[in-house]
């Protein structure tokens, strides 16, 4: 496990080199999955830490949820400000230092903008609100790389707005239900391509550059990774599939620290992060 399935394995040195390759503009990576329980927030945090560790860019993880999102349990939170606080102060955000007042930051340099834990109607993130946040955080190179953790409970206009903003998507899949949910996610993109012909190339591009992460959240799995990877590549048309082995340090929704993971998991997360950057370089 912990490998690039069906493809030539690259040494860590080459993966790191690929991960560091330049990007021409600010980019958005959306972690999306139709179902819950696939370790999406965990992988969002882990990939973000890998990217922040190896790149000099400003990297931020955003909790895109209608209520309490998962990233605030996976990354350190030192700031009471939330995405709604940022929205209320958009007029004052002109540069990175302004945005930084609303984020938390871990030792890798990865920043976090949380969704907060309020379920009040006026605290619910809307599609329009999300679009304004992305617009402000990508303006003037405020942040170079934005990782958006799309909560499984996000549907409708907000989810479509997240997909619209994405340059690349990462789709975690754990077990049979996760694989089915990943296929549903891809089918949603095809539906949007048919519904909005003027945006069809964008939605089809998200499929062709997508990275699927077969996430092993238990010590044993009944899935055959190579068979699943072949299905995603040949029938669905994604660009890459990476297997992430089970790691006890990443279970139970605990805080993520990539320095604590085992070697196989560390290599898999490095692989996953490198594949994300490779997909970004093809899409922008």
Residue ranges of predicted features:
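Extreme N-terminal, non-catalytic leader segments
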Residues: 1-31
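Walker A (P-loop) phosphate-binding motif
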Residues: 19-51
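Phosphate-binding loop that captures ATP/GTP phosphates
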Residues: 54-111
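Phosphate-binding/switch loop-helix module in NTP-utilizing enzymes
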Residues: 105-107, 112-160
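Conserved catalytic-core segment of NTP-binding enzymes
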Residues: 140, 150-236
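NTP-binding/hydrolysis catalytic cores, primarily Walker-type P-loop NTPases
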Residues: 251-284
């Amino acid at each position: 496990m912990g490998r690039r399935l069906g493809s030539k394995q690259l040494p860590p040195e080459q993966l790191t080199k690929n991960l560091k390759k330049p990007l021409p503009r600010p980019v958005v990576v959306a972690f999306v999955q139709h179902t819950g329980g696939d370790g999406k927030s965990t992988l969002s945090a882990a990939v973000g830490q890998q990217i922040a560790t190896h790149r000099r860019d400003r990297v931020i993880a955003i909790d895109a949820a209608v209520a309490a999102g998962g990233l605030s349990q996976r990354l350190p939170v030192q700031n009471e400000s939330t995405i709604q606080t940022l929205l209320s102060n958009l007029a004052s955000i002109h540069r990175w230092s302004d945005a930084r007042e609303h984020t938390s930051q871990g030792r890798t340099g990865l920043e976090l903008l949380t969704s907060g834990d309020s379920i009040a109607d006026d605290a619910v993130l809307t599609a329009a609100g999300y679009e304004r946040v992305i617009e402000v955080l990508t303006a003037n190179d405020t942040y170079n790389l934005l990782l958006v953790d799309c909560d499984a409970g996000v549907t409708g206009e907000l989810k479509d707005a997240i997909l619209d903003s994405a340059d690349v998507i990462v789709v975690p899949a754990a077990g049979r239900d996760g694989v089915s949910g990943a296929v549903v996610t891809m089918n949603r993109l095809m539906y949007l391509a048919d519904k909005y012909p003027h945006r069809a190339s964008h939605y089809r591009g998200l499929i062709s550059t997508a990275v699927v992460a077969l996430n092993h959240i238990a010590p044993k799995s009944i899935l055959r990774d190579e068979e699943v990877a072949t299905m995603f590549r040949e029938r669905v048309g994604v660009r890459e599939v990476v297997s992430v082995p089970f790691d006890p340090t990443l279970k139970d929704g605990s805080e993520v620290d990539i320095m604590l993971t085992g070697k196989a998991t560390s290599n898999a997360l490095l692989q996953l992060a490198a594949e994300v950057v490779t997909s970004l370089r093809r899409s922008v």
